[in-house]
């Protein structure tokens, strides 16, 4: 997915793309919720039908929590989406992703949480989205056509040799 025309034109030199819209669904103990957080999510949780109703519900929960200056991820998430969404859709996912409790993580981690007051389940707001029809392996293979690729090579042991091969070296191994 991209919003950059130049990037889209570049990758289309190597592959044809199937149309694809990423619209994930969260499963909380058998209850299914639309992602990113949007009017479908708010309706599924609270039965709210308008952005105004959803905003009021979030504002009420934020006010009840009394959070004005979030000091950790938990507080920041509650301030952004309210207690219900935090408890059902943020807390467990974040704990699993980071291996830490939300109270132990800094607030800035969740500042980019997508929240939309529309009935749009499209996770990305990009005009170009797709999956290569022949797969990513075929696409990358075409991108690397004519380029020497060395696998299972210890760059760090042979650094001087490889550094002299080109002006720029892209090292993707562990440091």
Segments from the language model and where they lie:
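Aromatic-residue-lined binding/catalytic grooves and analogous aromatic/hydrophobic interfacial grooves
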Residues: 175
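Active-site/ligand-binding neighborhood in enzyme catalytic cores
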Residues: 22, 26-167, 172
């Amino acid at each position: 997915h991209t919003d950059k025309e130049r990037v889209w034109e570049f990758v289309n030199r190597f592959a044809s793309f199937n149309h694809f819209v990423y619209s994930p669904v969260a499963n909380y103990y058998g209850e299914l919720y639309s992602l990113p957080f949007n009017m479908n999510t708010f309706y599924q949780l609270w039965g709210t039908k308008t952005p105004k109703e959803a905003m009021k519900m979030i504002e009420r929960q934020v006010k009840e929590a009394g959070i004005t200056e979030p000091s950790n991820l938990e507080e920041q998430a509650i301030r952004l989406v309210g207690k219900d969404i935090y408890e059902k859709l943020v807390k467990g996912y974040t704990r699993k992703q980071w291996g830490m409790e939300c109270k132990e993580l800094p607030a800035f981690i969740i500042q980019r949480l997508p929240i939309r007051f529309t009935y749009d389940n499209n996770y990305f707001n990009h005009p170009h989205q797709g999956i290569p029809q022949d797969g990513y392996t075929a696409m990358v293979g075409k991108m690397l056509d004519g380029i020497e690729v060395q696998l299972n090579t210890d760059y760090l042991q042979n650094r001087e040799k490889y550094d002299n091969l080109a002006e720029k070296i892209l090292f993707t191994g562990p440091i």
